[in-house]
Amino acid sequence: MAFCFSALLPTLYPTDAETLFTTLAAHDVPYALLEGTRDVWLRDFMPVRTGSGKLVSFRYEPCYLKNDPVLRTDFRKDLAPQLGLPVTYSNINLDGGNVVFSPSGAHVLISDRVFSENPEYPSAALVHELSELLE
């Protein structure tokens, strides 16, 4: 499996990208550049891999990009067609960068911002659905 980076990385951060890619190549670490992203932070909008290996894609409409929608990548529309991954989709608004699994994968930490960004969900229902999705 290759590490994936946004194809924007070499354009926006050429020196850092060159250092990173040279280092990866020197250690025979495969990597790929992903076309169609609108920002370099793939972790925020790509699917989250659960402890069992299932991929879950959340709606990515973070409050911090409310006034800058050009930076918001819609995984389902912009990237999923070219990747063909088996993904479970959720309408929960969640920045994947706010999802951190414990080393065992048995527990997950999520920023409490998930509650303010999903006002249509009662808190208990949101926690329950996240527990089901993230196993």
Model-found features: residue ranges?
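The feature marks the mature, well-folded catalytic cores of soluble enzymes
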Residues: 1-135
